[in-house]
Structures are given as structure tokens and as C-alpha cells.
Amino acid sequence: MRFGKKSLFALGLALSLGLGAFSGAIAGDNGGHGKSGHGSHWTYEGEGESGPAHWGELSADYAVCSKGQSQSPIDISGAQDQDVADVEFSYEASAINILNNGHTVQVNYDAGSSITVDGADYQLLQFHFHTPSEHTVGGRSFDTELHLVHKNDAGELAVVGVLMARGAQNEAFADIFENLPEHAGAVEKLDADVNADGLLPTDRSSFRYTGSLTTPPCSENVKWIVLKTPIELSDEQVDGLHEILDDNNRPVQPVHTRKVISDTAR
């Protein structure tokens, strides 16, 4: 039996005390993308009282969700070309476990994989999914978005976003999508290792900007690297993920005075 959004949230809430692999704004799920450690009950229920429009009212810890000037996601348009150093990806194969935390399906990753951005190393902690995409490009939404969450030694976050569109079957995700936990609180552990490098497009050109977590507490000063080239998933893969997650995307937020950089990978 598959659970819809409301059922997932209710069950996830009941199990929340038993899920705590981490605590706090960052540790709640290695970057705040999912169930936060603060305990206020937020959802994706549109205009509902716990939905995205009201996250900033649910807790003083979430105030930046409504008051912040550097919130994510955004619609990416008018990006400025800039010659910047490529993001260096140093991913290793990892044993993984897949957690359904009631807000997303999160894949926890072993230590030892990283990216280098602007000369700083960020360790890969986990990746997870949003359906449909959170970022849009020139107003265009995509079927799914993958977020790979990284943290450096200073506790600062960098998130790589991968846009995903319907197309051919993507074998790189086969083991993951065949073992998606359907119930909130459920965990699946894969026997086979997965290398996150194989989940990314070959062309690593990107849009970069400074933003926030896309879930409460919506903490800012997150480095965002949204890869320009979408990857494909089959209808079966997209629909299977959406059947579990329903719509778990925060609406796009105002860009305000931020600059979005467009870089071309060498």
C-alpha cells in the first residue's frame, strides 16, 4: 500500500522521536531538507496553516522562512556569465541506506566523498528528492529534482541540485528506485554500493547563487550549485517517486538583489 502526503506526514509525526539520527537545524537530516529537529509541524499542504506560506509563523526558529532575503528555491533567469573555477567532484562508492522521513526519501551516504567549491571542501552527507522540481529555469518546472547536501568543517552547507525530466530509463538510479521505502519511518539498506558521481550529468556546467535550505528552518548562507543539464528518468521512475512523495516542493522565492552566476565547466 502506498501512502499519500497527509498519511505520510501523520505517520512520520508519530514516529519522529524514533527517527533521530541527528538533531538541530543542520543535523535534523544533514541539511534541513526533511524533518527538522525543532519539532514544529510543517507540511507542503499548499495554503494550509502548516504549509509553505506559513512556515515562518510556526516557530520562532522558522522566522527566516518568511523574513529572509536569500531564500531558496528560485526561478533561475537572467544569470550572469562568469569565469569561475569548476566545482570539483570527488565522489566514492558508498553503502547506502534509504530513509522515508515523511517529507522526502533521503539516501544517507558514507563519509569520504566531497566537492570543492571556491577552494573549500564540502563532505557529501546525503541526497534526496523533490517532486516536482523546486528550482525552475526561465519559468520551466521539471518533473523531479535531486539535492546532494554537503557540509564543510565550519558547518557551512553546499547543495548540488540536479534537474530531472521524463525520458529514458535511468539505470544509475535503478537500485535506489527499486528499494524506495513507502512508509514514513521505514529504512531500506542496499546490498550494492552506489557512486553518486554516476547520478550526475556528464556536463557539470552550473548556475550558482547564495540561498537557503528549502525546508524549515530555511537557514540561509547555503551555496547552491544547480547543474544546467537535466538528466532523464523514465515515466515509471518519476511516477513511482511521486506516488510516495506527492508534491514536496517549496514554491520559488524572490531573488531580491542576489546575483545568479552562470558558469561553463571546462
Language-model region placement:
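Alpha-carbonic anhydrase
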Residues: 2-7, 12, 20-266
